[in-house]
Regions:
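N-terminal subdomain of nucleotide-sugar transferases
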Residues: 2-54
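A short, histidine- and acid-enriched strand-loop-helix "catalytic/donor-clamping" loop
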Residues: 87-91, 108-125, 138
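Glycine-rich, highly charged phosphate/nucleotide-binding loops
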Residues: 61-74
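Membrane-proximal helix-turn-helix segments that form the acceptor-binding/catalytic region
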Residues: 70, 101-106, 122-138
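An aromatic- and histidine-rich active-site surface loop
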Residues: 82-106
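Donor nucleotide-sugar binding/catalytic pocket of nucleotide-sugar-dependent glycosyltransferases
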Residues: 134-169
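Short acidic/histidine-rich motifs immediately flanking catalytic phosphotransfer sites
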Residues: 77-81
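A short helix->loop->beta-strand "cap" motif at the edges of active sites that frequently abuts
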Residues: 106-109, 158-160
Length: 169
């Protein structure tokens, strides 16, 4: 075993709470999370998928969100990193807000993974979205053009940004 790998395995063990759409949901975030779950990094980083959003009636959505937040109260403390898979819409961000607050109270690293870059143009006046970006430790985007757009449209957001081109590589 290489020395660097040994150091990484012993001293850099991280556990990641992955927050996003429910397994039972449909759409891009669920598709990405299903793919990530099959990758070696999922096991290496001891990831746990906490589904917060589900399609259906308002009652069903609210009940699902409540259960996820309640579950987070008990499990978030076991994780070092909380990785939010989200879009700029206020509804999804509002549902995930209590978990972000818990992460901040627990001094966890918070990653905001923005899945729908083409919505960046439509949310420049969305103060809640801007607030979210400013309170995360890293913002992940799926393409360099979204990184450029984010930097251009949201100059007030100083949070470090990275691009993940293809999580499968």
């Amino acid at each position: 075993m290489r020395f660097r790998q040994l150091i990484e395995d012993v001293f850099m063990k991280h556990r990641v709470l992955v927050v996003g759409a429910a397994r039972e949901s449909t759409g891009g975030v669920t598709t990405v999370l299903n793919l990530c779950e099959k990758m070696p990094m999922w096991k290496k980083w001891q990831c746990y998928w906490l589904g917060t959003q589900l399609h259906g009636s308002y009652g069903r959505k609210a009940w699902y969100a409540f259960k996820a937040i309640f579950r987070a109260i008990f499990i978030i403390w076991k994780y070092d990193i909380v990785h939010f898979h989200t879009t700029p819409d206020k509804g999804g961000l509002l549902i995930q807000l209590p978990i972000l607050i818990m992460a901040k109270i627990g001094r966890k690293k918070a990653i905001m993974h923005i899945h729908v870059g083409n919505q960046l143009n439509d949310n420049t006046e969305n103060k809640f979205f801007i607030w979210w970006m400013q309170h995360c430790d890293v913002i992940v985007l799926l393409a360099k053009k979204w990184l450029n757009l984010l930097s251009q449209k949201y100059p007030q957001v100083k949070t470090p940004k990275v691009v993940v081109y293809n999580a499968c590589e």
